[in-house]
Amino acid sequence: MSSRRPGCAGRGRTVEVDAPRAFLLQTVTRLCLNELDSARARREESRGDRLPEPVDLGLLGGDAVEALDQISMAFLVLLQRLTPAERAVLLLHEVFEMSHSEIGALLEKSEAACRQLLGRARAHLASERRGLRTSREEHRRLLLAFVEASRNGEMDRMLTLLAEDATLVIDTGPDGKRLGRIRNVGRPVEGATRIAAFLAAVARQIPAFGEARECVLNGEPAVVYVREGRPAAAILISAAEGRIRRVFVQVDAGRLGHLGLRQ
């Protein structure tokens, strides 16, 4: 395998790569770590929460759908809470089935350090994901009922659907802290009562959010609001024991434009 690397006066030079897989993994891993460090710094600077892009698996087709079927929005959000190094070790070990020695060479860390990072990542994900499982039918029922209740501003009904310690996360974009005329939406809303009150206020101030379309995102039931033929918001949840534990609302147009919106 040949690779182009920058040389003098902006020209590239060709080098032979003996181990293409290792070279590609190292290059991509380094680029991802740099981007993660940069993204983490941007999030801290903006003091807002960002959500991963919702993924329409139907647009990928084939093996990709099967491989990504278990990557729920809740799991991707949990991954974001790991440090870049923890995330890299977890994915390289679990997805690419690399040994600790291979990962250590890639990240320039000792095997012991990689084992420790993997252990921390697994422990964190296990503690956060514990109990966040429900049947697809129950998941869909809770989602549709919650979307209807929130759209109509029905606080009492929302309270019957939300867990007491539920969390609402709204991503309005890298610079946005406003939803319509409602300010300060860059931080999660904690607790069922606060979430219901907040969404009731949204329903009063933004009565025509668009047409609600049921779809599947990240392998899970979801609802996308469509306005003038374009996605305006995507709503996903995680649930356990018959109650909604997390509500994820993506309204950043830059992270919605790729959705297929198939009928």
What are these model-predicted stretches?
Residues 164-206, 212:
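A solvent-exposed, acidic/Ser-Thr-rich amphipathic alpha-helical stretch
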Residues 1-148, 154-157, 161:
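Active-site-adjacent scaffolding segments
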Residues 50-53, 172-174, 228, 250:
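Short, solvent-exposed coil/turn elements at secondary-structure transition points
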